Swiss-Prot record:
Catalytic reactions of this protein: di-trans,octa-cis-undecaprenyl diphosphate + H2O = di-trans,octa-cis-undecaprenyl phosphate + phosphate + H(+)
Its membrane topology: Multi-pass membrane protein
Name this polypeptide is given: Undecaprenyl-diphosphatase
Main location: membrane
GO cellular component, as recorded: plasma membrane
Functional note: Catalyzes the dephosphorylation of undecaprenyl diphosphate (UPP). Confers resistance to bacitracin.
Gene that this sequence comes from: uppP
Species classification: Bacteria, Pseudomonadati, Pseudomonadota, Gammaproteobacteria, Pseudomonadales
């Protein structure tokens, strides 16, 4: 492993860790950054699975107290069973649609132009959602009804389009469906666990032949980097949403997306030939 490969692993690990749980699309940033630094091919597909798994493990660690409370309360606490049921219900739409359409989406939509367009459109929707009057019906994730969970689950499927953002779609969906800002954000984190683990297991099995012993050092660097920066991002976001809206993320999405589109339109970067 040379210095440049190690540097690429660090950069992409940082990008994954920082963006996975912010409403700005980690997949979109990975596609764009990987293209800029020339990290692609079969190794990149395997590497992405590893760093996404690291990011979700960071959330598992951050919410380990709540997870243990739910696990040990399944047999005796109705709220633990209700929470688990809501999580599974919200998870199912992504399972069904992911199995049916994942390959088609990866083939035709995993490119910087799609990402940039989705960033802009998603940013505009976020601004619209933030400026609507919020009527909070649910202050805590334990108080959610099954209908809230199912609707958020369907909204999460929009994130199959790269650039949309899984966390962004579920958080904004939660706000629109009556969840408080804290409840929507926390449920988005919890929903990420089965969704991302399921996606990682599915992709890992499907592309198992891509994992080579020679790539272990690269994978290790990316894993550790992604885990650390995901922890930082999750803690920072939980503090941020206590006193701020998501408007700053919306404007970032719009500006970043327009910048990518501008570089393509004026011929500065040939994004149209890039592929994730």
């Amino acid at each position: 492993m040379d210095f440049w490969t190690a540097f690429q692993a660090i950069i992409l690990g940082v990008v994954e860790g920082l963006t996975e749980f912010l409403p700005i699309s980690s997949t979109g940033h990975q596609i764009i950054v990987a293209d800029l630094i020339g990290f692609g091919g079969e190794r990149a597909m395997a590497f992405n699975i590893i760093i996404q798994l690291a990011a979700i493990l960071a959330v598992v660690w951050e919410f380990r107290g709540k997870i243990l409370e739910v696990v040990f309360g399944l047999t005796s606490q109705p709220k633990a069973r209700r929470f688990t049921g809501n999580l599974l219900l919200a998870f199912m739409p992504a399972v069904v649609l992911g199995v049916l359409f994942a390959d088609l989406i990866h083939e035709y939509l995993f490119n910087p132009i799609t990402v940039a367009t989705a960033l802009v459109v998603g940013g505009v929707i976020m601004l619209w959602a933030e400026r609507r009057e919020h009527r909070v019906q649910v202050d805590h994730v334990d108080d959610m009804r099954w209908s809230h969970a199912l609707k958020i689950g369907f909204v999460q499927c929009l994130a199959m389009i790269p650039g949309t953002s899984r966390s962004g779609s579920t958080i904004i969906g939660g706000l629109l469906f009556g969840l408080s800002r804290k409840a929507a954000t926390e449920f988005s984190f919890f929903l990420a666990m089965p969704t991302m683990v399921g996606a990682a297991v599915y992709s890992g099995y499907k592309y198992r032949d891509l994992f080579q012993p020679a790539d272990l050092p690269v994978f290790a660097i990316g894993f550790v980097t992604s885990f650390i920066f995901a922890m930082i991002a999750v803690r920072a976001l939980l503090k941020f949403i206590a006193n701020h809206s998501y408007a700053a993320f919306a404007w970032y999405r719009i500006v970043f997306g327009l910048l990518i589109l501008a570089t393509w339109q004026f011929g500065w970067v040939d994004w149209s030939t890039a592929h994730g």
